[in-house]
Swiss-Prot record:
Keyword annotations of the record: Calvin cycle, Carbon dioxide fixation, Lyase, Magnesium, Metal-binding, Monooxygenase, Oxidoreductase
Cofactor(s) needed: Mg(2+)
UniProt protein name: Ribulose bisphosphate carboxylase large chain
Positions of substrate binding: 116, 166, 170, 288, 320, 372
Regions crossing the membrane: none
E.C. no: 4.1.1.39
Function: RuBisCO catalyzes two reactions: the carboxylation of D-ribulose 1,5-bisphosphate, the primary event in carbon dioxide fixation, as well as the oxidative fragmentation of the pentose substrate. Both reactions occur simultaneously and in competition at the same active site.
Family note: Belongs to the RuBisCO large chain family. Type I subfamily.
Residues binding Mg(2+), per UniProt: 194, 196-197
Biological process annotations from GO: reductive pentose-phosphate cycle
Note in the entry: The basic functional RuBisCO is composed of a large chain homodimer in a 'head-to-tail' conformation. In form I RuBisCO this homodimer is arranged in a barrel-like tetramer with the small subunits forming a tetrameric 'cap' on each end of the 'barrel'.
Cited Pfam families: RuBisCO_large, RuBisCO_large_N
Length: 473
């Protein structure tokens, strides 16, 4: 007759994974989840279930728990808070011991923290609101290949935001016509142009031809203007091997920066590419295509501030951040919060901006936020005020949509940028006095004057879907 050697069966998660008196360690990875439980499910039980299913637990007791120090390795739900203005959900705070995760692998961290637990039947919805990475874990990650200061030195441009443009139409141009569009934008006054996120290697424009014509445009514009000019060459590809092949070719051409779609391309590929860029002296621009599928639902998914932290650890020198004023989602307070996460060494907990934990990045370089998406000349004063100097302001349609063409569109943006920076430096409240600043600058710039007339009625005044919970109070 078999002898029962351990307490088999199913027991409540809270008996093992709910520890309200636990004090998180400096080395713990901390997570804040917004949990919407199924009707009738107890808060403490479902918080403990999230801690269990995202760490060591499963649905039943297993005898192999006796072969390890479960109390050391388990995640612990240690605090529950109400969500302001929403009684259908609550915040649960979970602490994970650092040894649960492979060093330097945000892939491994996300596999646990936002893995199978998001499909748990006891939950109607689950959202990762914030994560605190301890400095002990941060130090195991490569981070940005170079960072803000190195990019400034490469570009030899200081004291203002960098100015860019996404080439439009994003799809359908031949390589030669694409290169022509790049040249016109750069000679008109832009610092950067870029491939759009879905420009890879399609039948109408294969990547080698695009790279060749882009580099020709860069060199011609540089020769004419005497300024350093750059284009982000998108190396996103079907396989890692093909991605590195394109990156190597960009390097051979002399391009200083390449681009990657980090979510569709994958975090494993992104970390590898960041390491390659560090070793080869290349800057890395990151597009966030697919992010809104993950982060826009206020009750389920992964908040963009979490994706921002993860990508800073994985590695990039630029990241698209939204604009506040353009066509894409993102309120001012939240956007300022994740801009700080990109650039600052230490970010203090600040619920008014959606930041739930202190975050220390130590000596890890900062990252340039990229404002892009539906912006034009009338937005410049607000963008200069919101983003400051260490940023890239990227006007796609707001450059190539100019009635006189790409070069005049670029000139209009360069004139207004310099006018706004000058006004700010003179102590003028540039966002408040923006109309006067632009009107004065337009007196000496017909390109700016016609741009202001063209887009004077264009606004994107839609309510934000993913509001800060503090705003509901």
């Amino acid at each position: 007759m078999a002898t029962k050697t351990y307490n088999a069966g199913v027991k409540e998660y809270r008996s093992t994974y709910w520890e309200p008196h636990y004090t998180p360690k400096d080395t713990d990875i901390l997570a804040c989840f917004k949990i919407t439980p199924q009707p009738g499910v107890d808060r403490e039980e479902v918080a403990a279930a999230v801690a269990a299913e995202s760490s060591t637990g499963t649905w039943t007791t297993v005898w192999t728990d006796l072969l390890t120090d479960l109390d050391y390795y388990k995640g612990r739900a240690y605090r529950i808070e109400d969500v302001p203005g929403d009684d259908t959900c609550f915040y649960a705070f979970v602490a994970y011991p650092i040894d649960l995760f492979e060093e330097g692998s945000v892939v491994n961290v996300l596999t646990s923290l936002v893995g199978n637990v998001f499909g748990f039947k006891a939950l109607r919805a689950l959202r990762s609101e914030d994560v605190r990475f301890p400095i002990a874990y941060v130090k195991t990650c490569g981070g940005p290949p170079h960072g803000i200061q190195v990019e400034r030195d490469i570009m030899n441009k200081y004291g203002r935001p960098l100015l860019g443009c996404t080439i439009k139409p994003k799809l359908g141009l031949s390589g030669k016509n694409y290169g022509r569009a790049v040249y016109e934008c750069l000679r008109g006054g832009l610092d950067f142009t870029k491939d759009d996120e879905n420009v890879n290697s399609q039948p109408f424009m294969r990547w080698p031809q695009r790279f060749d014509f882009e580099q020709e445009a860069i060199e011609k514009a540089h020769g004419e203007t005497g300024e350093r000019k750059v284009h982000y060459l998108n190396v996103t590809a079907p396989t890692p091997g093909e991605m590195y092949k394109r990156a190597e070719y960009a390097k051979e051409l002399g391009a200083p920066i390449i681009m990657h779609d980090y979510l569709t391309g994958g975090l494993c590929a992104n970390t590898g590419l960041a390491n390659w860029c560090r070793d080869n002296g290349m800057l890395l621009h990151i597009h966030r295509a697919m992010h809104a599928e993950l982060d826009r639902n206020p009750h389920h998914g992964i908040h963009f501030r979490v994706l921002t932290k993860v990508l800073r650890l994985s590695g990039r020198d630029h990241l698209h951040s939204g604009t506040v004023v353009g066509k894409l989602e993102g309120d001012r307070a939240s956007t300022l919060g994740w801009i700080d996460i990109m650039r600052d060494t230490f970010i203090k907990e600040d619920r008014s901006r959606g930041i739930f934990f202190d975050q220390d990045f130590g000596s890890m370089p900062g990252v340039m936020p990229v404002a892009s998406g539906g912006i034009h000349v009338w937005h410049m004063p607000a963008l200069v005020n919101i983003f400051g100097d260490d940023s890239v302001l990227q006007f796609g349609g707001g450059t190539v949509g100019h009635p006189w063409g790409n070069a005049p569109g670029a000139t209009a943006n360069r004139v207004e940028l310099e006018a706004c920076v000058k006004a700010r430096n003179e102590g003028i409240a540039v966002e408040k006095e923006g109309k006067a600043v632009l009107t004065e600058a337009a007196n000496d710039s017909p390109e700016l004057k016609i741009a202001m007339e063209t887009w004077k009625e264009i606004k994107f005044e839609f309510d934000t879907v993913d509001k800060l919970d503090i705003a509901h109070k």
